[in-house]
Amino acid sequence: MAVAALLVAGCSSAPQTGTQAKQDLRDSAKVKASAYEGAMIYYSLPSPLEVAYIVENSGISYEPNVLHKTELGVRYSTTKSQAINLGIYGSDLSYSILFNQQQVALKYLDCIKELSSGLDVSDTTSVKKLREMEDNIHDKEKLKKIVAQTFFHSDALLKENSRRPTAIMIVAGMWIESLYIATELSGGDPTTNPSLTRCIVEQGLVFDDLLGMLSSVSGNDDIAYIKSKIEVIGKDYDNIKSALGGSFVFTSENVTVDAAAYKRICDDIKAVRTEFTQLF
């Protein structure tokens, strides 16, 4: 289907311990492997729906101002801008669905359909599922099920050499938008909402997976561009990881993060997201 799979996130819901905690986290994230030019690429990238669940359960109210403007969708004309922003709109769709914003969700569906068509990543299954979402727009539970199961089945595209770069760009857009929503709602302060902070920090577990996917594609300027932009976020995660004792696996529910380091990664996520949304 069109591409941007709702891959289950590396945001755990309860504290665990040691090696088993990490294994359980990876298992729950449904870590997959796909062959690409002889290399095994492991990925457990964040699901927009999963991050939206964290936001929904954190007690924070719906904040439409953090979402990308739907009216800008028609302005994206290059493969890079269309793919990245298709992923961004996919995350915004999930967020809108969980907060019962049906009319907003419909607008994001329209953007997704338009960009999918422009990228030639739609197929019969994807069109059917998008139509099913429209038909069930007022049924939150049904929508959640549809999105979680079949929003964009990226597996086939990630294994298809000709469209793999496009699929990876969409996944990167989804990843950055999910983190952007969470960091914006936290206000750049790690003490605002412990569950959001933990979710954001735990994405350090999967950053290398995304970087590995990007690195698996050579000779593609669009992929190289995305890689160069997100590497600053990787450095932020390295700094946070070092301060936390060298691990993103926690034995307590709350995570104590240096305020300056947390603010820095929030600012860098925002900067990357802003640039991605302005690729006209």
Q: PLM features: residue spans?
A:
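C-terminal motif of bacterial Sec signal peptides marking the signal peptidase cleavage site
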Residues: 7-10
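A cross-kingdom marker for long, charged
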Residues: 12, 213-280
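Bacterial lipoprotein signal-peptidase II cleavage site
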Residues: 12-19
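N-terminal Sec/ER secretory leader and immediately downstream segment
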Residues: 20-132
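Long, amphipathic, charge-rich alpha-helical segments that form helical bundles/coiled-coils
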Residues: 68-76, 80-92, 112-133, 137-140, ...
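Non-transmembrane, amphipathic alpha-helical segments
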Residues: 74, 78-81, 93-100, 104, ...
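Secondary-structure edge/capping motif, primarily at the C-terminal ends of alpha-helices
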Residues: 93-100, 119, 157-161, 182-190, ...
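Extended amphipathic alpha-helical interaction segments
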Residues: 138-223
